[in-house]
């Protein structure tokens, strides 16, 4: 566990000291903001639902995956783990509004991967592109200093497990 905490701290310090740029600041803020409250993923799901047919089913499964992920992260894991965010732990200045909840796991990343993996399970060709966007979402949260790398990894795993669970249950 100590190795993970040390690794997380080193990555955060490296990003803060070496990777800052105006372009990345703006780009990562835009990426991160698109995931606020899961808006982009919910919009994608409702777009699929509106298309009907198999796409409707994919959208409904995406919504269900997001609900499972959000419940796991926000109602169970974050309140249990209570990990302080890196900007608060290290006194770092951040360029977005200061999040008020805990750091572990990354909810933005969990939602992104729940939606993306759900789509991937329904349609691999479309889903692979959404998985790439989910990875960028995760990076944005570390870049903006509001999550540690392991928060993002855990969010990705929880999101994918949530989608896998929903898809397994729906096929029975």
Tell where the protein language model's regions lie, with residue ranges.
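N-terminal transmembrane-helix/juxtamembrane module of multi-pass inner/ER membrane proteins
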Residues: 1-40, 74-101
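Membrane-embedded catalytic cores of phosphoryl/pyrophosphoryl-handling enzymes
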Residues: 91-172
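Alpha-helical transmembrane segments
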Residues: 34-40, 63, 126-132
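Membrane-helix interface segments
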Residues: 23, 54-58, 123-129
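Interfacial segments of alpha-helical transmembrane regions
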Residues: 45-71
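Alpha-helical membrane-inserting segments
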Residues: 47, 68, 72, 76-77, ...
């Amino acid at each position: 566990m100590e190795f993970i905490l040390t690794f997380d701290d080193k990555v955060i310090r490296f990003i803060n000291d070496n990777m800052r740029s105006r372009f990345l600041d703006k780009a990562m803020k835009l990426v991160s903001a698109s995931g606020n409250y899961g808006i982009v993923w919910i919009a994608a799901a409702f777009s699929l639902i509106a298309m009907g047919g198999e796409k409707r089913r994919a959208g409904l499964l995406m919504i269900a995956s997001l609900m499972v992920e959000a419940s796991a992260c926000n109602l169970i894991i974050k309140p249990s783990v209570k990990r302080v965010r890196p900007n608060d732990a290290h006194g770092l200045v951040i360029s977005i509004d200061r999040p008020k909840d805990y750091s572990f796991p990354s909810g933005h990343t969990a939602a992104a991967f729940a939606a993306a993996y759900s789509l991937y399970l329904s349609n691999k060709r479309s889903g692979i592109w959404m998985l790439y966007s989910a990875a960028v979402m995760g990076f944005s949260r570390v870049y903006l200093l509001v999550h540690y790398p392991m928060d993002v990894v855990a969010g990705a795993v929880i999101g994918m497990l949530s989608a896998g669970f929903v898809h397994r249950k729906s096929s029975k």
